[in-house]
From Swiss-Prot:
Pfam (any one): MutS_V
InterPro entries to which the protein is assigned, alphabetical: DNA_mismatch_repair_MutS, DNA_mismatch_repair_MutS-lik_N, DNA_mismatch_repair_MutS/MSH, DNA_mismatch_repair_MutS_C, DNA_mismatch_repair_MutS_clamp, DNA_mismatch_repair_MutS_core, DNA_mismatch_repair_MutS_N, DNA_mismatch_repair_MutS_sf
Lineage: Bacteria, Pseudomonadati, Pseudomonadota, Gammaproteobacteria, Enterobacterales
NCBIfam families membership: mutS1, PRK05399.1
Highest rank taxon of the organism: Bacteria
Gene Ontology biological process terms in this record: mismatch repair
Listed name of the protein: DNA mismatch repair protein MutS
UniProt entry keywords in alphabetical sequence: ATP-binding, DNA damage, DNA repair, DNA-binding, Nucleotide-binding
Length: 853
């Protein structure tokens, strides 16, 4: 690529380009040239590959041809969306000078930088997902992590204590762009993530961070936000805010506060748990058959995003949860009236962000007006709901009568996409604008009359008055009649089948039309900008209203789901434990064609671990997952799929369910399983809900059994967590006899010949057998293989009839049967001293040992 070193050798235009490019060396530069954005040199080559557009040349500069690629300015959003989705950032360089008054290249400057984490344009965002920018910082005491959703102004920080917690946060928030310090030590934590941006160390400096944040919020200190004593989080937040200011190049009035997220405020779920429970993403990476796919019937995009945040951060404050439950109960008879009105509110949250950034388009203001028009009806529908939480939401919504009337007066009903197209401001809003428009419209009427007059006067039926951007207004006469044109008609352009002329009268009106249109458009832009100044003082109240509307949408949605799907309202208890009557899996019951078999569950301090046995495909994993999902739903304040639920305090949910090789990190299935198990054993508490499925697979039988036994023993005796422990090791069914607080349950099945019927019902006690061969037959394993397996099974059982009931002593961890007695031959050999034997004695010993064996 050509560089700034040999600047004088370039043309003036390329000198200007290279200076701007030097300020943004690592990102693509969209350089405005008339109706196109153009890219040069390496940017052009990269863009042609990323966007699949033609790579051409634009003349030469400094004696070298200039590689060039271009895109039309009116289609820029589509191309930006493609680049942002690929993790690219783009600097947008606009012409800010007037070509008519400029000598040499028109003045240009970068007006904004579009990055994956700072986009607010509607066309670039997925409407039902948060789009987060994040920053990560690390020192010897732990991590600092900050996230910002620029499309809502939601600014959060946290201080994860260890690597596992940090990994879980990255998975929960899934940022579109991640800023990290150039000396970041835990590179394996972030490698492979999209939108990584390396930043200099000084951007994470704590004093600069405090100064930046106080300046943004207009405060003297950060005590009021509860983040004063979170230095690592503040380092990350400071870098993040600086980056946003650098890229947006405008004030950020919608970012008004920062909130500390503390571990003790929410139920903690690690990365494996979020993945295994398929909350918003299934194991294949899609969104089908997830908890969100069943629960999310919200009618606004901002409500959908809020619901997903709730699902990923269940709260532990039962006062908040009971308020939500009361609201859901009160709205169950109202959702049919409320949802159609809420649907009209749309994505007010993101419209307000664009308003704050002054990038809102005319249609954003029209949508905002439409949203505000719904408030009186919503307030009326909620007025007689006798629940304090509902009335709180109603108050937060506000009315905004003046703003609504302002938008009704100022913006036409169906405005164009862009203000530069004109026709946005409504007639009657500005007298001066109406006058200029009348002049432009009057001149246009005159031109229509001129065409009729000239056609009749000259008797030329092909004569017509037209306009194009290059030649302005003209009179066109067909080639066949052009010889009849009067002498004062001055030829302006010759076409294949026609001639175009100009006359002084037409030129005079052209000037008048263009002047009046130009004046009207300039005034319209000015009035449009003034609308922002009138709306922005109310931004904080509008954001509060948008948040209340999103929450109302979520709660109305949960009321509808509870009613439609037959969910019950769970009750919270101070005592540890979970009691579920007729619990169901919220997703599986929707997918199944046949009725779902509901099952009970009881966990309490005296029954804190269930050893779950039963056949493969019998429903063990479903039973375990449904328990976790019912707990999760209860702790977002939702109703749950069961007949009755009572649930005690829960601080964490862990799942060790299913596994696959992590080939990218060089870890086998067994290694993945053991890593997840270690995390559980280190971090679970007596208030944790732990799901352990088939621990010990992937290694030898006795190794696996030993590990499973020791893990179960540790969870039951030492940690005392609420545990569901599914296993195929029947030896573990003896645990209830050796430890208090452990019970056996099994999933029932009936076997008839070579077939098996899964009953999917949970019964007390251990399963009688595994039904492995019946499941294999059901899976389509050839009959001769099944037949041979039955023979082998009988052989093994005859050799070791007690193998399945091996006595396992929990105190000694002797997982094999009691040691066998030493044979006489071995005893004789142990007492033998070979160095003292003569050759004859040695030979006699061989015969003697032979007889002992």
């Amino acid at each position: 690529m050509s560089t700034i070193d040999n600047l004088d050798a370039h043309t003036p235009m390329m000198q200007q380009y290279l200076k701007l490019k030097a300020q943004h060396p690592d990102i693509l530069l969209f350089y405005r040239m008339g109706d196109f954005y153009e890219l040069f040199y390496d940017d052009a080559k990269r863009a042609s590959q990323l966007l699949d557009i033609s790579l051409t040349k634009r003349g030469a500069s400094a004696g070298e041809p200039i590689p060039m690629a271009g895109i039309p300015h009116h289609a820029v959003e589509n191309y930006l969306a493609k680049l942002v989705n690929q993790g690219e950032s783009v600097a947008i360089c606009e012409q800010i000078g007037d070509p008519a008054t400029t000598k040499g290249p028109v003045e240009r400057k970068v007006v904004r930088i579009v990055t994956p984490g700072t986009i607010s344009d509607e066309a670039l965002l997925q409407e039902r997902q948060d789009n987060l920018l994040a920053a990560i910082w690390q020192d010897s005491k732990g991590f600092g992590y900050a996230t910002l959703d620029i499309s809502s102004g939601r600014f959060r920080l946290s201080e994860p204590a260890d690597r596992e917690t940090m990994a879980a946060e990255l998975q929960r928030t899934n940022p579109a762009e991640l800023l990290y310090a150039e000396d970041f030590a835990e590179s394996s934590l972030i490698e492979g993530r999209r939108g990584l941006r390396r930043r200099p160390l000084w951007e994470f400096e704590i004093d600069t961070a405090r100064q930046q944040l106080n300046l943004q919020f207009g405060t003297r200190d950060l005590v009021g936000f509860g983040v004063e004593n979170a230095p690592r989080g503040l380092c990350a937040a400071g870098c993040l805010l600086q980056y946003v200011k650098d890229t947006q190049r405008t004030s950020l009035p919608h970012i008004r506060s920062i909130t500390m997220e503390r571990q003790q405020d929410s139920i903690i779920m690690d990365a494996a748990t979020r993945r295994n429970l398929e909350i918003t993403q299934n194991l294949a990476g899609g969104t089908d058959n997830t908890l969100a796919s069943v629960l999310d019937c919200t009618v606004t995009p901002m409500g959908s995003r809020m619901l997903k945040r709730w699902l990923h951060m269940p709260v532990r404050d039962t006062a908040v949860l009971v308020e939500r439950q009361q609201t859901i109960g009160a709205l169950q008879e109202r959702y049919t009236e409320l949802q159609p009105v809420l649907r009209q509110v749309g994505d007010l949250e993101r419209i307000l962000a664009r308003l704050a950034l002054r990038t809102a388009r005319p249609r954003d203001l029209a949508r905002m007006r439409h949203a505000l028009q719904q408030l009186p009806l919503l307030r009326e529908l909620l007025a007689d709901v006798d629940r304090q939480p509902v009335q709180k939401l109603r108050e937060k919504m506000g009315e905004f009568t003046e703003l609504r009337e302002l938008l009704e007066r100022s913006v036409i009903d169906a405005p164009p996409v862009l203000v530069r197209d004109g026709g946005v401001i409504a007639p009657g809003y500005s007298e001066e604008l109406d006058e200029w428009r009348a002049l432009a419209d009057g001149a246009t009427d005159y031109l229509d009359k001129l065409e009729i007059r000239e056609r009749e006067r000259l008797g030329l039926d092909t004569l017509k008055v037209g306009y194009n951007a290059v030649h302005g207004y003209y009179i066109q006469i067909s080639r066949g009649q052009s010889h009849l044109a009067p002498i004062h008609y001055v030829r302006r352009q010759t076409l294949k089948n026609a001639e175009r002329y100009i006359i002084p009268e037409l030129k005079e009106y052209e000037d008048k039309v263009l002047t009046s249109k130009g004046k009207a458009l300039a005034l319209e832009k000015q009035l449009y900008d003034e609308l922002f100044d009138l709306l922005l003082p109310h931004l904080a109240d509008l954001q509060t209203s948008a948040s209340a509307l999103a929450e109302l949408d979520v709660l109305v949605n949960l009321a509808e789901r509870a009613e439609t799907l037959n969910y019950c309202c769970p009750t919270f208890s101070d005592k540890p434990g979970i009691r579920i009557s007729e619990g169901r899996h919220p997703v599986v019951e929707q997918v199944l064609k046949e009725p779902f078999i509901a099952n009970p569950l009881q966990l309490a301090p005296q029954r804190r671990m269930l050893i779950i046995t039963g056949p493969n495909m019998g429903g063990k994993s479903t039973y375990m997952r449904q328990t976790a999902l019912i707990a999760l739903l209860a702790y977002i304040g939702s109703y749950v799929p069961a007949q009755k639920v009572e649930i005690g305090p829960i601080d964490r949910i862990f799942t060790r369910v299913g596994a696959a090789d992590d080939l990218a990190s060089g870890r086998s299935t067994f290694m993945v399983e053991m890593t997840e198990t270690a995390n559980i054993l280190h971090n679970a508490t007596e208030h944790s809900l732990v799901l352990m499925d088939e621990i010990g697979r992937g290694t030898s039988t006795y190794d696996g059994l030993s590990l499973a036994w020791a893990c179960a023993e540790n969870l039951a005796n030492k940690i005392k967590a609420l545990t569901l422990f599914a296993t195929h090791y029947f030896e573990l069914t003896q645990l209830p006899e050796k430890m208090e607080g452990v019970a056996n349950v099994h999933l029932d099945a009936l076997e008839h010949g070579d077939t098996i019927a899964f009953m999917h019902s949970v019964q007390d006690g251990a399963a009688s057998k595994s039904y492995g061969l019946a499941v294999a037959a059901l899976a389509g394993v050839p009959k001769e293989v099944i037949k041979r397996a039955r023979q082998k099974l009988r052989e093994l059982e005859s050799i070791s009839p007690n193998a399945a009931a091996t006595q396992v002593d929990g105190t000694q961890m002797s997982l094999l049967a009691a040691p066998e007695e030493t044979s006489p031959a071995v005893e004789a050999l142990e007492n033998l001293d070979p160095d003292s034997l003569t050759p004859r004695q040695a030979l006699e010993w061989i015969y003697r040992l032979k007889s002992l064996v």
